[in-house]
């Protein structure tokens, strides 16, 4: 399983429209990626590591694919349209991390 994470760094000047991201961008993304995208998750940063500190990332989006080749084929076919939507929800470029998921469980084993 491959996870593609988009990490939106937090700052005082950063703008992020979570409503637009969740209700317009992600559905558009899912439609374009089709069945290649197996799962999505969106997170909103609440706090940093120290009590009361701001989160390092204001928002994070995660996309899951069966393999790297599937992600590359699906994403690269629509990369221009997907990235052109960025100004509609944020004024910062996300940091992108592509990872191999090694453990993914629905509940902890005791």
Residue ranges, per PLM feature:
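Macromolecular interaction modules
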Residues: 1-110
């Amino acid at each position: 399983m491959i996870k593609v994470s988009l990490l939106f760094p937090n700052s005082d000047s950063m703008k992020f429209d979570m409503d637009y991201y969740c209700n317009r961008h992600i559905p558009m993304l899912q439609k374009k990626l089709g069945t290649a995208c197996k799962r999505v998750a969106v997170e909103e940063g609440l706090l940093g590591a120290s009590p009361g500190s701001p989160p390092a990332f204001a928002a994070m989006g995660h996309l899951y694919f069966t393999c790297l080749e599937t992600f590359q084929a699906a994403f690269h076919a629509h990369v221009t349209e997907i990235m052109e939507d960025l100004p509609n929800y944020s004024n910062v470029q996300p940091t992108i991390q592509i990872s191999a998921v090694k453990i993914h469980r629905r509940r902890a084993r005791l």
